[in-house]
């Protein structure tokens, strides 16, 4: 039966048109890594298109949409589109957006870790905003024969504005499918031992290559998480507590105290109060207080992006130096580090239990 022969009224139905279903014993399994998203190009037009989608999400901006859309379209997009495009252009890689490049490397690095009794575990990625969209990739996975999908957000700490909205988009796509795959979700892994180990290894390896801060002389390690409005904490979002939990476990793994290590929150947007202390003012204060060296690491970002490369590496660095600091280090995110790839495989394996697939670790892939 050709889709061309289907009556037009059938194409306007609520559910997506699908080919006839055939019984299969394969039960192919897919692991879908989900990240926030990125513009397709470092141009004002592409950035405005991306920001319009991102900032129109009611889980991201929780104010009445009629009021917000007027502000967004008349003030924010015209002003921020061009300014943000310049920032993206400064960090753009030859292969494309840093977030997309590092996410693709994560996918390609994780694939060798999965094997299953004659079946292959499909590993792919999608973005909540921009391309490739969650809906498009779920449709591709279905066409590839995936009957079971594990949604694995690249957000270690749960938040309504990140994890929940990614699940919203996935379930909305499923809601348009007549023949839905079975789906599981990973809510968070803020305290997962493999994730904490990967963070600690990333810091240790950076220090092995660039020298360890002189903590006895007052140097500091700053753990900077993405901020959210403080009212979300008051409304019951667990994000703040999970960030603090991750930070405490990482400090313990590194053998550091709260005197040597600070926890801050970055990327504040708008005039409302967000989670504090804020990253940039904290670094400026540290510089003014005579701290010679500050290392900044972003545990909540699993891949480097505009917020880590430009905001931390340039803007926050300048605040520290202008405050009087002498030596600033931005420790790269987990990206495709061997310890993080092994952790992704372990987290996925735990959440695939009970499905007809066995997850095997390939030693050569994590050595």
UniProtKB/Swiss-Prot annotation:
Keywords: Cytoplasm, Heme biosynthesis, Iron, Lyase, Metal-binding, Porphyrin biosynthesis. Pathway: Porphyrin-containing compound metabolism; protoheme biosynthesis; protoheme from protoporphyrin-IX: step 1/1. Its EC number is 4.98.1.1. SUPFAM superfamilies: Chelatase (SSF53800). GO terms for cellular component: cytoplasm. NCBIfam families: hemH (TIGR00109). Catalyzes the ferrous insertion into protoporphyrin IX. This is Ferrochelatase. It comes from Burkholderia mallei (strain ATCC 23344). The gene is hemH.
